[in-house]
Amino acid sequence: LDEDNDCRMKDVIPVFEKEVFLERLKRIASIIEMPYNEVVQKFIDRYSGRLRHSVSYMLGASNFYMPIFEEALETYGLPLELKYLPVIESALNPTAVSRVGATGLWQFMLATGKRYGLEVNTLVDERRDPIKASYAAANYLSDLYKVFGDWNLVIAAYNCGPDQINKAIHRSKGSKD
């Protein structure tokens, strides 16, 4: 028996029918709409396939970060589902920097981070501080909800900026769909 080859666990990628995902999404109690469509399926395929090892890292990191996110969101009375935003924004990497300069778990742009009290200078970048950035993000999300009143628009505005969402609403003649 060659232990190295015969006893090694194989990386199995589970495959589920569309109905399984639909049923699981229906069972999630949330005030934030969670649609299932081709784009969602594409991300499910990506994260259960070639990015599977990233998911392992994120699951491990979530044990540390999720309680911080939850506390900040609860402080501002926000839906706890928003704790998954940094998973999408940064893959739970506190040192992540996007191609446009958004930094940290919550991917704050410089001006937005400073507007929400995060210190950024040559010595420190609090956008990378999990606790301070989480409270700043919760404050920002709360402000966005006061403006848009719809969680899908809030999430979109968080990602691309409120000005872009306002322009899209204006182009669609006021429709928020």
Name these PLM-found stretches.
Residues L78-T95, V154-N159:
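Short, functionally critical alpha-helical segments immediately adjacent to catalytic or ligand/cofactor-binding
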Residues P162:
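Active-site-adjacent helix/loop patches that line small-molecule binding or acyl-intermediate pockets
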Residues L1-Y76:
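An acidic, Gly/Ser/Thr/Pro-rich helix-cap/linker signature
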